[in-house]
């Protein structure tokens, strides 16, 4: 299946690709190309074995046809003729052949995505090997060096470092199209590819790795990529904790150590001293989660769910601590005198844990630190039994555990002091320090769970309309969780669709009613997401900060107010450019209001993974925030559809976290903030005008055109997406489950549907009209002014660069195929979309001075060009299947099977585009 043929032995049949010769990939001139060729060849072998040679020949014909269409040009006579032949062939095949075709291209993308992931890591390691680490862009070393270049040194640098706080919050999105089973299988394939990178590989080992790859690809061929049953909230919790086990727990101390080493080098210290002296870097990551706590529009999340979510998290984190202690117990094999405080501690441990004492005394006589770690591990085990038991804990768990994380921290501090006295500073500030950092970060709860609920639910509960009683029970659950796991386990309550100060006060009143004297410690977080709410958020927070009961509550909480800004719904309502400017102005309002009232503002950015929901390159987005909005702190959602991409691989996770650290530190320097203020002062009127016109153009199509909703329903697979069972949350907050009304439809499926149709409309529509109108009104000076702003203002550059990315990933020729499903009645709407696309591309190219989209990002540009023909194959199949299934009566016996194939194409297109919603 690969697009480039290797120079190697061939089969007599040209459809069967030969495997690359040689051993492994370590010495290949182009290891990525070699891996893609190998995976394509192995997949071809599996297709022949499992479906026959005719199936592979069909796949090859379709692949060559889509490539030919691209080569000729979709609008050319040759391209149209080629497409007609392809459509006729696809329309004639039976359902079994269609499934083989869909599976072949889908699995090809899953495999090549792994190869590209490996190449990212390979390239990063190469940069680290060939130059000073500070030369790597957006690393923590670059962050520290950048601060020095910007004049942030000495006490000012230390102050910024002490206040550094980054809080990624994991969410369970219904747009992670891949099953957990598939993700785990792909990790196995990745490890086998990694094995082939070993330069010491022998021919026998190479053959073994290839055999195992064939085996895994065969298993993937027979594994359904879509779920038969939608996952429940606790399934999503367990998936998140698998990421915790494999990546977050391991990578977190590595990040701290990387920053510690960078600070030491920057201060002129000897690099070898890192790990031998007390670290200055604190645990600045504050991991959060909405998984099991977000009940906005999700009736499957209840108070019981939230309780169970914390139990699952605690079980994972305490098992992780215990495993580390048992591992260190095996390595800290030091003979040392047992006297003083150490002897007293060992005697106390033995008296309280006599069974453990007998085993440790037998195994480790004269090795006090191994025995000490053995006791700590046993106490952690008992702590886990006590905290995670649904019923009464076992008798052994009642005594001997740690009552709080602080008690375990004190035990580790005591051990560190005793080991340091024995001359073991390297061990104290090495592996033991990593455990102390992990404990400081994760406590006994793992991820800090947050509750989110719609403001209308609170109003109804206050009025006595809480039919299940779950609203009040949620507050009781929060109080219980805090008693059991500590306040850090759950203390934030997010109010979606906040419209007034009363919405925040209502949460405190409900907590008082539910818990009585045991009111939980809560930080109330208003979420502003609609255009009206973003415009008035400053006034709402002003009223909130002057409301007597709430102000008293805020004083008790340390005069710190967190506010969340929603990127997804604001973009769906107003379009990408207008929403970006609304969010920027909202930040400015909130900064000013909180400054006036002497309250510390903490902003929480509810960014989606997709560009149409506020996603995009994160470093650029952080550097483009309003001046004063970062100040060493960042809190943002890590949406479900990108969690696996960012965190499944520890090396990529570490790189991502280094980039976040870099961006936060750079954005917090006075020089950067001054640059932002100067640029914003000159560009505010321009953005006011652009945003107004962009919003007007977007809303004229999406919200004011009476035929648009029907066109959207026909020209995208939105109705079919709603039945896929991707996540535990319904696609809409209210209304029809299978075909929700547009205003009730969540932003996620909204963007997902447009991504599947290849139009990507939410990320760019309206931008071209706004730019063109500005240039028309301001004539010769308009383009010059826009170019000046693009060069000088990170916010404006980020907004346009994001639009360019979305446009480059869109494909109007394929989108027109989807639009044809809407019939002639939808033609005017499609023509509006196509015209605006062409206008937006033209305006952005004029403004940036580029000849083609992404000319400044040639690697990504080439990747999209290479992938598009393969994605086209799946898109063509999806269009045909959608047409068939929609023409069928609901009771047709074939309808269910056709829908299953549609869902398979959705999964495949998402893999090919590396994007969902």
Tell me what each language-model feature is.
Residues 44, 587-597, 838-844, 848:
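Hydrophobic cores of alpha-helical transmembrane segments in multi-pass integral membrane proteins
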Residues 712-720, 725-917:
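C-terminal accessory/interaction regions of large nucleic acid-associated machines
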């Amino acid at each position: 299946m690969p697009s480039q043929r290797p120079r190697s032995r061939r089969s007599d049949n040209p459809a069967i690709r030969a495997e690359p010769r040689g051993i492994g990939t370590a010495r290949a001139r182009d290891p990525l190309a070699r891996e893609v060729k190998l995976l394509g060849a192995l997949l071809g072998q599996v297709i022949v074995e499992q479906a026959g040679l005719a199936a592979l020949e069909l796949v090859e014909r379709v692949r060559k046809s889509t490539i030919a269409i691209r080569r000729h040009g979709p609008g050319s006579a040759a391209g149209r003729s080629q497409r007609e032949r392809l459509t006729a062939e696809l329309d004639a095949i039976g359902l079994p052949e269609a499934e083989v075709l869909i599976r072949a291209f889908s699995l090809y993308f899953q495999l090549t995505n792994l190869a590209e992931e490996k190449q990212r890591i390979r390239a990063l390691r190469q940069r680290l090997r060939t130059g000073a680490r500070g030369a790597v862009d957006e690393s923590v070393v670059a962050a520290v060096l950048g601060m020095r270049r910007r004049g942030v040194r000495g006490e000012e640098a230390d102050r910024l470092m002490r206040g550094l706080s980054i809080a990624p919050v994991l969410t369970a999105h219904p747009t992670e199209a891949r099953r957990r089973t598939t993700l785990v299988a792909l990790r196995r394939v990745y490890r086998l590819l990694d094995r082939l990178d070993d330069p010491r590989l022998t021919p026998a080992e190479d053959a073994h790795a290839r055999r195992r790859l064939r085996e895994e690809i065969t298993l993937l061929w027979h594994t359904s990529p879509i779920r038969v049953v939608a996952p429940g909230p606790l399934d999503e919790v367990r998936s998140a904790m698998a990421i915790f086990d494999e990546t977050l727990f391991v990578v977190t101390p590595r990040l701290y150590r990387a920053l510690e080493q960078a600070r030491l080098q920057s201060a002129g210290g000897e690099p070898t001293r890192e790990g031998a002296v007390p670290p200055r870097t604190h645990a600045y990551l504050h991991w959060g989660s909405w998984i099991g706590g977000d009940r906005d529009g999700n009736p499957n999340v209840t108070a019981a769910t939230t309780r169970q979510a914390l139990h699952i998290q605690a079980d994972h984190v305490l098992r992780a601590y215990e495993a580390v202690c048992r591992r260190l117990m095996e390595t800290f094999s030091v003979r040392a005198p047992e006297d003083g405080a150490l002897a007293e501690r060992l005697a106390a441990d033995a008296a309280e844990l006599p069974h453990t004492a007998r085993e440790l005394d037998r195994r480790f006589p004269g090795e006090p630190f191994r025995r000490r770690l053995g006791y700590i591990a046993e106490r952690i085990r008992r702590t886990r039994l006590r905290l995670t038991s649904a019923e009464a804990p076992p008798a052994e768990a009642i005594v001997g555990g740690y009552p709080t994380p602080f008690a375990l921290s004190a035990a580790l501090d005591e051990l560190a002091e005793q080991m340091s006295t024995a001359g073991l500073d390297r061990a104290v500030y090495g592996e033991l320090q990593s455990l102390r950092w992990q404990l400081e970060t994760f406590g006994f709860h793992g991820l800090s769970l947050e509750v989110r609920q719609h403001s209308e639910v609170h109003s109804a509960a206050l009025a006595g309309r809480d039919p299940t009683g779950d609203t009040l029970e949620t507050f009781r659950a929060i109080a219980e969780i805090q008693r059991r796991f500590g306040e850090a386990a759950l203390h934030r309550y997010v109010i979606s669709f906040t419209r007034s100060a009363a919405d925040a006060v209502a949460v405190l009143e409900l907590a008082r009613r539910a818990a009585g004297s045991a009111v939980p410690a809560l930080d109330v977080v208003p979420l502003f997401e609609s255009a009206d709410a973003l415009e008035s958020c400053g006034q709402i927070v002003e009223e909130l900060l002057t409301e007597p009961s709430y102000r008293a509550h805020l004083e008790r909480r340390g005069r710190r107010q967190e506010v969340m800004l929603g990127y997804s719904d604001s973009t769906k309502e107003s379009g990408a450019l207008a929403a970006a400017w609304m969010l920027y102005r909202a930040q400015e309002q909130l900064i000013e209001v909180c400054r006036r009232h002497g309250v510390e503002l903490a902003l929480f950015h509810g960014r989606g993974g997709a560009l149409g929901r506020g996603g995009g390159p994160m470093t650029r987005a952080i550097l483009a925030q309003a001046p004063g909005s970062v100040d060493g702190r960042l809190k943002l959602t890590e949406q479900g559809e990108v969690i696996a991409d960012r965190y499944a691989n520890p090396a990529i996770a570490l790189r991502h976290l280094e980039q976040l650290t870099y961006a936060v530190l750079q954005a917090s320097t006075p020089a950067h903030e001054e640059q932002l203020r100067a640029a914003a002062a000159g560009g505010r009127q321009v953005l006011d005008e652009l945003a107004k016109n962009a919003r007007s153009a977007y809303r004229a199509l999406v919200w004011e055109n009476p035929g648009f909703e029907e066109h959207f329903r026909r020209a995208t697979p939105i109705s079919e997406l709603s039945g896929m069972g991707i996540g535990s949350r319904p696609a809409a907050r209210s209304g029809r489950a299978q075909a929700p009304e547009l205003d009730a439809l969540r932003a996620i499926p909204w963007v997902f549907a447009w991504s599947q149709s290849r139009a990507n409309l939410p990320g760019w529509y309206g931008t071209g009209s706004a730019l063109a109108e500005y240039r028309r009104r301001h004539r010769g000076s308009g383009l010059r002014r826009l170019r000046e702003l693009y060069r000088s203002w990170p916010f404006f550059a980020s907004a346009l660069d994001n639009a360019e990315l979305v446009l480059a990933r869109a494909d109007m020729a394929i989108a027109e195929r989807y639009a044809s499903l809407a019939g002639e009645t939808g033609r005017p709407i499609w023509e509006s979309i196509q015209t605006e696309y062409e206008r937006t591309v033209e305006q952005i190219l004029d403004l940036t001075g580029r000849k083609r989209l992404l000319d400044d990002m040639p690697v990504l540009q080439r990747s999209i060009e290479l992938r598009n023909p393969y994605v086209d194959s799946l898109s063509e199949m999806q269009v045909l299947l959608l047409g068939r299934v929609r023409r069928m009566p609901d009771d047709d016996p074939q309808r269910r099977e056709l829908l299953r194939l549609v869902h398979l194409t959705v999964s495949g297109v998402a893999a090919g585009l590396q994007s969902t919603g």
